[in-house]
Structure formats: structure tokens, C-alpha cells
Amino acid sequence: MKNVLSIQSHVIYGHAGNSAAVFPMQRLGVNVWPLNTVQLSNHMQYGHWAGSAIDAAKMEQLVDGIAAIGALKRCDAVLSGFLGSPAQARAAVEIVRTVKATNPNAWYFCDPAMGQTGGIRPEPGVEEFIVAELPELADGMAPNHGELQKLAGQRIETVAEAVEACRSIIRRGPRLILVKHLHDRNSPADRFNMLVVTETEAWIGQRPLYAFPRHPVGVGDLTSAIFVARRLRGDSVRAAFEHTLAAVHAVVKATYDARRYELELVAAQDEIAQPSEWFGAWVTGAD
């Protein structure tokens, strides 16, 4: 069974960061080692919260502890999400390097949380660090539309421009870019677009967009987690993308139908594993 070290925020109540990522990856048959960068009572969109961030040095100490018992060599991938400070971002880089030195076959998937995540904003300097340092280290990245624009340093209004932006990042290091939410001026307003791009291929997929009174937090974290888990299980890029598109839709639909604010992960767990409704991806902008 594959193992992933997941470095993200955590909420006790609800689903954001590792609280949105761990269970879906486990349900897909992947062992998850959660390292929580922030521990909060709930995500901050509620307007009240309690909690704090973990010290960056302790992040490295925790991973050193795993190495000390000889288990780090079994880590197959690292997934990073919210990094609250430049010190945490630097610690994450050192952790990834340690994992890759211990297991040269391990890979790193970066969800570059640069904006508000569950109401949390990273400290000044985190965005600049992510843009400057992480593409060279990452094997894959999962930005949303705004994060893609920041990483590529360009405005994006069409799918063709998004593919071009992804390729510019790929030239810096990653093998693939998963765009978790793509705004395309040519797409219907009731569709949610996702895109995945490699050096030579690109696929786009659409799912229904639901009109929530308050949009649930953690959908992006869920998206990255499912994609990573399917890749660890051996899916091709396209197969992992299509499964992710379908499984995330199932969770979002279950949440909408139940009129809930928090993601219905447990209720939709069978759909995460085996979605009943699929949305095929089609080739776009391929060389």
C-alpha cells in the first residue's frame, strides 16, 4: 500500500486542509501521514475560531522522528497545502528534500495555497517563496485560476492561455499542472472547469456548478487529495483527472442536496471510491 505525507492545515470541526484530504485518500486505499501546519477549531469563515500554527522547526523534528524509526523510506509522495509562514514553507522544502533523499522514487505534489484558505491568509512572503522556489522542487502542482496567474506571471482568460501558462511552469520543473478551477470566458456560466496539463498533452473537464448560499470550504484540498491518491494507485494522468472530476462532483452534489455547509465526505464516501456519474475529459491545446 502506498504512503503519502500530507502537510496541510487541519480543523477539528468540519473539512478543510487535512480534514478534507486525509479520509478521501484513505478511502481510495492510500495510507496518509498527516502533518498539520495549523490546528484550528474550525475554518475561519464561521467568524469565530480558536487554534494556532505549529512551529516550523517542529515540522522538521516530526519528520526526523519518522526517519529515526526507519519508516521514512516507505514514504511514496509528499502533498503540501497551506503553509502559513515563510519559515513553514522553508521547512516543507527541507522535508521534501529529506523524503526524496531517503526514497529517490518519492514525488512531491504542491497545492500552492497563496490566497485565503478557509479564512486563513498566509503571512507576507509566503506567496513570493512559493512562486520563486516550489516549481523547481515539485513534480506536480495544483493551482486554482488565481494561483496559476501568479505562478506564470500572466493574466489568463481562455483555455489556450491557461495551457500556455501551465507549460511555462512545467519548463521550470513540474511534470504536470492540475488547475483545480479554471475561469474561461467562453464557458457556460453553470459549468465548473478543471484542466490538467503535461509537457505534451492537456485535458479539460467540466462538471455542474452548484449555487450554494455559502460555498463550502475545502473543495480544492479534496481535489488535490483525490488526484494524488489515484496517481499513487497507478492511474494515468487522464484517468486520475477524470476520477477526480467525478468524485469531487459527487461530494459537492451530496453537500448541496443535503443543504450543508461542510462537505459531506462520509456520506459520499462510496462515490469517492467509485463515482456513479462521470464527466469525460477531452484533449485541448495538445502539441
Swiss-Prot record:
| Associated pathway | Cofactor metabolism; pyridoxal 5'-phosphate salvage; pyridoxal 5'-phosphate from pyridoxal: step 1/1
Coiled-coil stretches, from where to where?
none
Q: Which residues bind substrate?
A: 9, 44-45, 221
Q: Please tell me where ATP binds in this chain.
A: 111, 142, 147, 180
Enumerate the catalysed reactions.
pyridoxal + ATP = pyridoxal 5'-phosphate + ADP + H(+)
* Needed co-factor(s): Mg(2+)
Q: Name one GO molecular function term.
A: magnesium ion binding
Gene3D superfamilies according to UniProt: 3.40.1190.20
An example Gene Ontology biological process: pyridoxal 5'-phosphate salvage
Pfam families under this entry? Phos_pyr_kin
Secretion signal span: none
Which family is it part of? Answer: Belongs to the pyridoxine kinase family. PdxY subfamily.
What do we know about how this protein assembles, alone or with others? Homodimer.
Protein name per its UniProtKB record: Pyridoxal kinase PdxY
- Protein's organism: Burkholderia thailandensis (strain ATCC 700388 / DSM 13276 / CCUG 48851 / CIP 106301 / E264)
Q: Which gene encodes it?
A: pdxY
